[in-house]
Amino acid sequence: MRLIFLGPPGAGKGTQAKLLTERYGIPQLSTGDMLRTAVAQATEVGKRAKAVMDAGQLVSDEIVNEIVSDRIDSADCARGFILDGYPRTVPQAVALDRMLEEKGLKLDAVIELKVDEAALVRRMENRVTETVAAGGTVRSDDNPEAFRRRLQEYREKTAPLSEHYARTGRLKTVDGMADVHTVTAEIEKILA
């Protein structure tokens, strides 16, 4: 089973990916984790990524695509995987399609968690309040202004992926505003 989750920050993609990872025994592939691992292991592509990051630049699609390709080739991905944070743009999605085709693989589903943005901001504010009340540390980008910037960036760069996958007939949508278990049940219906 090979899946992609789409949706804005705070929609519950990570929560759902974790639940499905546990249920189906397939890895959740996070772009950030893959990048850090490649750099730590000093792979050829990891060295190139490190040089770019050390120069304070953004890692190119070419490097990210190569890291994803290498990770998909890992033994633990033989039964499938859930992509988290990739693809972020239509060019990355096109590269992923090409990459999977070359490997004789295909995506089983692209699942978009549809959510109300105003409710997402309230969710984030509640999470901050609960974290502070519990004596925890709040992320620096967990404030309404930063969160709205992340939502805007999502709308501009990542939301067009929905149209891309809808055109190819692979996009399935789920109401991400429901409770966690209801969302999981809806996703499992899609995967059945």
UniProtKB/Swiss-Prot annotation:
Q: Tell me the compartments it is located in.
A: Cytoplasm
Output the GO biological process annotations, alphabetical, semicolon-separated.
Answer: AMP salvage
Q: Which residues bind AMP?
A: 31, 36, 57-59, 85-88, 92, 139, 150
Q: Which domain of life is it from?
A: Bacteria
User: Principal localization?
Assistant: cytoplasm
Any one GO MF term held by the record is: adenylate kinase activity
Which reaction is recorded as catalysed by this protein?
A: AMP + ATP = 2 ADP
Keyword set, alphabetical order: ATP-binding, Cytoplasm, Kinase, Nucleotide biosynthesis, Nucleotide-binding, Transferase
Could you give the domain comment from the record?
A: Consists of three domains, a large central CORE domain and two small peripheral domains, NMPbind and LID, which undergo movements during catalysis. The LID domain closes over the site of phosphoryl transfer upon ATP binding. Assembling and dissambling the active center during each catalytic cycle provides an effective means to prevent ATP hydrolysis.
State how it assembles: Monomer.
Report the HAMAP family cross-referenced here.
Adenylate_kinase_Adk (MF_00235)
The protein in question is named: Adenylate kinase
Specify the species: Rhizobium meliloti (strain 1021) (Ensifer meliloti)
Classification from the root reads:
Bacteria, Pseudomonadati, Pseudomonadota, Alphaproteobacteria, Hyphomicrobiales
